[in-house]
Curated annotation (Swiss-Prot):
SUPFAM superfamilies attached to this UniProt entry: Probable bacterial effector-binding domain (SSF55136)
Keyword line: Repressor, Transcription, Transcription regulation
Organism of derivation: Escherichia coli O157:H7
Name the UniProt record assigns to this protein: Probable transcriptional regulator YgiV
Gene, per the UniProt record: ygiV
Physiological role: Represses expression of mcbR.
Highest taxon in the source lineage: Bacteria
Pfam families registered for this protein in UniProt: GyrI-like (PF06445)
């Protein structure tokens, strides 16, 4: 992990309309759902990666959730409604509100360090409380040629 210290900010996150592909399966199979979402994006052009924001919605902690109960949504911002399609991508919305946000730099396999840094260290010291809502990931530099070690992901922890 390349995050040695966390720079955490509190923001008011706006609600964002998204194209959403739910992943309801083992965490190890998440990349298959991601590939499906990428194919949908390329085929339809409705949420192009170079013009739209890309998000992950983490409903569950893969370390503590039974594999068959794991839930994660793959999302891309959109400006128009999503028609029915063979990929299972549908209309959704990311819930707005107050969030603590910190940047994770590096491999996504290590993102739990950033999440737990916010929850276990920053949150108690800040006096803030976590709201019952999923954690959001905003993948800020997805592009051809970006190595995993250089990925930048904003981690949003919902606040009460």
């Amino acid at each position: 992990m390349t995050n040695l210290t966390l720079d955490v900010n509190i923001i008011d996150f706006p609600s964002i309309p998204v194209a959403m592909l739910p992943h309801r399966c083992r965490p190890e199979l998440l990349n298959y759902s991601v590939a499906k979402f990428i194919m949908w994006r390329k085929e339809t052009g409705l949420s192009p990666v170079n013009q739209s924001q890309t998000f992950g919605v983490a409903w569950d902690d893969p370390a503590t959730t039974a594999p068959e109960a794991f839930r994660f949504d793959i999302c891309g911002s959109v400006s128009e409604p999503i028609p029915d399609n063979r990929y299972g991508v549908s209309n959704g919305e990311l819930t707005g509100g107050r969030y603590a946000v910190a940047r994770h730099v590096g491999e996504l396999d290590d993102i739990s360090h950033t999440i737990w840094g916010i929850i276990r260290h920053w949150l108690p010291a800040s006096g803030e409380k976590m709201r019952k809502a999923p954690i959001l990931f905003h993948y800020t530099n997805l592009a051809e040629g970006v190595t995993e070690q250089r990925l930048e992901t904003n981690v949003y922890v919902p606040l009460a």
